[in-house]
């Protein structure tokens, strides 16, 4: 949940900054081919920068502390559990971190399967049984083993490319109609101020709308991560963990930022912008074995 939201926000910010730099420096492509190349470079560039920054951003955002050497029995159990599951999943031992938060949560991130991070909240360790916590950790290990962050990066790169390309095509048309006069030497994109304003606004708007695609993919991969956890530690443990989440403390952020929602209580249109499917749907998918085949 958290890794996807941070990735999308960082990615959108990088993409907009690139667009601002291009417009302010007057680097505006005058041909469709040139614009497409620029969109590809900056679309995928923003995604990969977000991916490379993901571990640092995630740790900074929650104040997480990487465990170098276990200092108590709880940290020792956590390290041993992650090591065992990583070995079962065929990946290198991830870095392990703990962050202070009352809510039950965990996330995994990293640019590569063999250079990843798993972080859990103190709320998870305090409020979940060992079996439930084991299932949540296995869920995050499955995300790493499945390469979900890299796949998300590629999907986001394609989405970014279309957002930049379409936004700037429309901006060129708008600048030409509303203020551009190419005969007076204002450039092939028409009025530069209008071009700059329209392109920036459209990139923001289309970027938010395009997040529907990436959120759908995130929800789809959550089902597979649940199935991966069931294969690693057992279906009943994962179901028990999800049932625990239904009755857990609800973070304040979940009421104002749907990208961070994990409780699955939201309905209707807002589900399009959720990173996770509703918990009841995830439990039903595990019971039916739909993603375990």
Curated annotation (Swiss-Prot):
Q: Which cofactor does it need?
A: Zn(2+)
Cellular location(s): Cell inner membrane
Q: How is the cofactor bound?
A: Binds 1 zinc ion per subunit.
The active site of this protein is located at 140
Family annotation (InterPro entries): HtpX_protease, Pept_M48_protease_HtpX, Peptidase_M48
Annotated GO molecular function terms are: metalloendopeptidase activity; zinc ion binding
Record protein name field? Protease HtpX
Q: Which organism is it from?
A: Salmonella typhimurium (strain LT2 / SGSC1412 / ATCC 700720)
Lineage of the source organism?
Bacteria, Pseudomonadati, Pseudomonadota, Gammaproteobacteria, Enterobacterales
């Amino acid at each position: 949940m958290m890794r996807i939201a941070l990735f999308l926000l960082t990615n959108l910010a990088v993409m907009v900054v690139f667009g601002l730099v291009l417009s302010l420096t007057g680097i505006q492509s005058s041909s469709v081919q040139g614009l497409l190349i620029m969109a590809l470079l900056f679309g995928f560039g923003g995604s990969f920068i977000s991916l490379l920054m993901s571990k640092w951003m995630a740790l900074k955002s929650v104040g997480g502390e990487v465990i170098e050497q276990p200092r108590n029995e709880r940290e020792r159990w956590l390290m041993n559990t992650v090591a065992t599951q990583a070995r079962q999943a065929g990946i290198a031992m991830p870095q392990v971190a703990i962050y202070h938060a009352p809510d039950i949560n965990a996330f995994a991130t990293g640019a590569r399967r063999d250079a990843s991070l798993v972080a859990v909240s103190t709320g998870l360790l305090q409020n979940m049984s060992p079996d439930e916590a084991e299932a949540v950790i296995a869920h995050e290990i499955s995300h790493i083993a499945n390469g979900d962050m890299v796949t998300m990066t590629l999907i986001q790169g394609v989405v970014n490319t279309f957002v930049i390309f379409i936004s700037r095509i429309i901006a060129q048309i708008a600048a030409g109609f509303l203020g551009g006069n190419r005969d007076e030497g204002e450039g092939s994109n028409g009025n530069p101020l209008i071009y700059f304003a329209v392109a920036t606004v459209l990139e923001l708007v289309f970027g938010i709308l395009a997040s529907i695609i990436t959120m759908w993919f995130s929800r789809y991969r959550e089902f597979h991560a649940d199935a991966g956890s069931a294969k690693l530690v057992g279906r009943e443990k994962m179901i028990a963990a999800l049932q625990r989440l239904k009755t857990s403390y609800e973070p304040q952020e979940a009421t104002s930022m749907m990208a961070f929602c994990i409780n699955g209580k939201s309905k209707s249109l807002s589900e399009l912008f959720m990173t996770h499917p509703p918990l009841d749907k995830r439990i039903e998918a595990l019971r039916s074995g739909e993603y375990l085949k």
